[in-house]
């Protein structure tokens, strides 16, 4: 890739726009593709993404476009920020154009009917592409406002990791590398569920002890499940694990937190999602994660509890009673209990 060749960003949402701006600020021409031609035209003319990043100026180096074919043909490095429900249908018809290209997923979600992560779908669509993921405690608006931020690029392709670091690393954005693509990506997808729980807890006025307990036990659940699927537990002590979990469960800027907060205020799930106005991946992830945890017999009481509230007609008080009266457990799964007398 030369400096003159555009980097592609697929998706017109908040995170795709924030990454497009970062790339342009670092001197790289960017083509940001979006499905809606009216949105692309509006962003071209007004230099702003008012629906998803209102008040943030779109860098002059970002070219909003609606021609997917030309975008894919003209770029060797492509950042994919499409909703999990749309990624396969958008890219599968153009699989031949992706051969040998660098594809970096920015989407923190799981495909409902396959339980595949986004990078696994990319690998299936384009087996000869170079695949990576970018994940971490990365609120789009804060990135766009140049708050000091760090993230993780994960791939077994060291050259791809270096390439992503080179194009994104800057004065306010630091990029670390990892070889645990599966763990990094799974952490980003799973934490969305717990952000919904955290938002509910805040809306209901629960104390600091409760919020701390929720985040810590969420990390335990995430790690337990991820290790059962082959991830490295140490990944969850890094930016893509506990780092992402903390920011998503603590910030009103988090989309999934906002959904949970609305639920805690008494809105229905449909009303909460409608108020948000964009995709909250945690709602979709919850359904497939609950089923998968049952299938592989991994203990995930917070996931089961939230699912019971949203989809099984259980009340919050019933779920809290069940969780607090459950059989006592050891704190950390990876510490041996053989030392007990």
UniProtKB/Swiss-Prot annotation:
Active site: 191
Pfam families: NAD_Gly3P_dh_C (PF07479), NAD_Gly3P_dh_N (PF01210)
Ligand binding (NADPH): 14-15, 35, 108, 140, 255, 279, 281
The EC number(s) this enzyme carries: 1.1.1.94
Binding annotation for sn-glycerol 3-phosphate: 108, 136, 191, 244, 254-256
Any GO MF annotation of the entry: glycerol-3-phosphate dehydrogenase [NAD(P)+] activity
Reactions catalysed, as given in the entry: sn-glycerol 3-phosphate + NAD(+) = dihydroxyacetone phosphate + NADH + H(+); sn-glycerol 3-phosphate + NADP(+) = dihydroxyacetone phosphate + NADPH + H(+)
Transmembrane segments: none
Family membership noted in the UniProt record: Belongs to the NAD-dependent glycerol-3-phosphate dehydrogenase family.
HAMAP family: NAD_Glyc3P_dehydrog
NCBIfam families: PRK00094.1-2, PRK00094.1-4, PRK00094.2-4
Name assigned to this protein: Glycerol-3-phosphate dehydrogenase [NAD(P)+]
Organism expressing this protein natively: Pseudomonas entomophila (strain L48)
Lineage: Bacteria, Pseudomonadati, Pseudomonadota, Gammaproteobacteria, Pseudomonadales
Gene expressing this chain: gpsA
């Amino acid at each position: 890739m030369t400096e003159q060749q555009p980097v592609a960003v697929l998706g017109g949402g908040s995170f795709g726009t924030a990454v497009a701006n970062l790339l342009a600020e670092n001197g790289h021409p960017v083509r940001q593709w979006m499905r809606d031609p009216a949105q692309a035209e509006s962003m071209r003319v007004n230099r702003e993404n008012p629906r998803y990043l209102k008040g943030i100026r779109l860098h002059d180096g970002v070219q909003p476009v609606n021609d997917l074919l030309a975008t894919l043909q003209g770029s060797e490095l492509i950042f994919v920020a499409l909703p999990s429900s749309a990624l396969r249908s958008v890219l599968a018809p153009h699989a031949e154009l992706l051969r040998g290209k660098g594809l970096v997923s920015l989407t923190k979600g799981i495909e409902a009917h396959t339980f595949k992560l986004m990078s696994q779908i990319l690998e299936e669509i384009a087996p000869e592409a170079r695949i990576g993921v970018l994940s971490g405690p990365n609120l789009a608006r804060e990135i766009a406002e140049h708050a000091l931020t760090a993230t993780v690029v994960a791939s077994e392709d060291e050259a791809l990791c270096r390439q992503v670091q080179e194009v994104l690393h800057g004065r306010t954005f630091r990029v670390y590398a990892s070889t645990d693509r599966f763990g990094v990506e799974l952490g980003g997808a799973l934490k969305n569920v717990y952000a919904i729980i955290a938002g509910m807890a805040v809306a209901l006025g629960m104390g600091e002890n409760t919020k701390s307990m929720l985040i810590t036990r969420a990390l335990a659940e995430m790690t337990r499940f991820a290790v059962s699927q082959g991830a490295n537990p140490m990944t969850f002590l890094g930016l893509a694990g506990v780092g992402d979990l903390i920011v998503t469960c603590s910030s009103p800027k988090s989309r999934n937190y906002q959904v949970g907060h609305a639920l805690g205020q008494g809105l229905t799930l449909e009303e909460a999602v409608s108020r948000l106005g964009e995709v909250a991946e945690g709602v979709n992830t919850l359904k497939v994660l609950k089923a998968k945890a049952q299938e592989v017999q991994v203990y995930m009481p917070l996931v089961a509890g939230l699912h019971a509230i949203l989809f099984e007609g259980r009340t919050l008080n019933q779920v809290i009673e069940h969780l607090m009266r459950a059989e006592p457990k050891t704190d950390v799964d990876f510490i041996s209990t053989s030392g007990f007398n």
